[in-house]
A protein has these predicted regions:
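ABC transporter nucleotide-binding domains
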Residues: 2-5, 12-184, 189-203, 207-209
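C-terminal end-of-chain micro-motif
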Residues: 11, 297-299
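ABC transporter nucleotide-binding domain
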Residues: 169-255
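Short, charged/small-residue-rich alpha-helical element at the C-terminal edge
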Residues: 222-295
Length: 299
């Protein structure tokens, strides 16, 4: 499979701030990738580096299996990394025509791209009459004008109402089905889960996970426990079990994440032998949100 983008040991410092820390991952053709992390985790900085907007401190990245220079490769890239900025008194057609002129590309695809983002009926409306969601959709249309092989989006639904969020996500999925590779940055786990096939989880510039979204939630499960004994005693004994990767308190319960397969009867016997009688014991699969929190809290 063709590698659209490859990052190797990418690093960026802003003074004392280590924004991107030895980051490596590959983007394969035809997939939808999400860079997921809390605000300030280095997502936008990473996108800025690969788009030649931000200078890297060290490391390297290459486009299209290294066969093209960054300048040549960016002609095959569509990107939105800032708020949409169009002329308010110009129509959608006029604004996109101007972009085509600046990029020195044909205007023949304008109506096609407006249909993709569901703005064809408003093609002759002035930009100032658009809602925030419509403005974002027009920005996506502008990024598609050069028929890019990869579309890069930075927080594409940020600030939108639920309807606007739903529309943008549907458009992203539609574009992906047409064969365009997509890389988006988001702090919303729900967004990545619904839209992306692959995810790179980062925190403070460090990669915590890279792989398929569905494999991120594929684990050996977790135990929810409670006891009348002191909680710190239960937690200490659980932490001493080699089958358990991490333990944390959630309200009245103690949650233990498994690293290998283990049945409820096994953990019950183990605790009983160590002087703990449980009043509540349930085994279940963790949600993607719980997996994400476990990653970010324990790395």
């Amino acid at each position: 499979m063709e590698t659209i983008l490859s990052l190797k040991n990418l690093d960026k410092r802003f003074g004392r701030v280590h924004a991107v820390n030895n980051l490596s991952f590959d983007i394969q053709k035809g997939n939808v990738y999400g860079i997921l992390g809390p605000n300030g985790s280095g997502k936008s900085t990473t996108l800025g580096i690969i788009l030649n907007v931000v200078n890297k401190t060290s490391g390297e990245f290459s486009w299209f299996d290294g066969n093209l220079s960054t300048h040549q490769a960016l002609k095959k890239v569509g990107a939105i990394i800032e708020r949409p900025n169009f002329y308010p008194y110009m129509t959608a057609i006029q604004n996109l025509s101007l972009i085509c002129k600046i990029k020195e590309i044909s205007t023949e695809k304008i109506e096609e791209k407006l249909k993709i983002v569901n703005l064809f009926e408003r093609r002759n409306s002035k930009f100032k009459t658009y809602s925030l969601g419509m403005k974002q959709r027009l920005a996506i249309a502008s990024a598609l004008l050069n028929n890019p092989e990869i579309l890069i989006l930075d927080e594409p639904t940020n600030g939108l109402d639920p309807q606007g969020i739903h529309e943008i996500r549907e458009i992203i999925q539609k574009i992906a089905k047409n064969g365009t590779t997509i890389l988006l940055a988001s702090h919303l786990l729900d967004e990545v889960e619904k839209v992306c096939s692959h995810v790179v989880v980062i925190r403070e510039g460090v990669k915590l996970y890279s792989g398929r979204v569905d494999e991120m939630s594929a684990s050996h499960g977790l135990f929810e426990l409670n006891t009348n004994e002191p909680k710190n005693k239960l937690i200490s004994i659980l932490n001493n079990n080699s089958n358990i990767g991490s333990v944390r308190e959630e309200g009245d319960l103690v949650v233990a994440y498994l690293t290998t397969e283990m049945e409820a009867t096994d953990i019950n016997n183990y605790l009983f032998k160590n002087g703990i009688t449980v009043s509540h014991l349930v085994k279940r699969k963790p949600s993607l949100e719980e997996q994400f929190l476990d990653l970010t809290n324990n790395n």
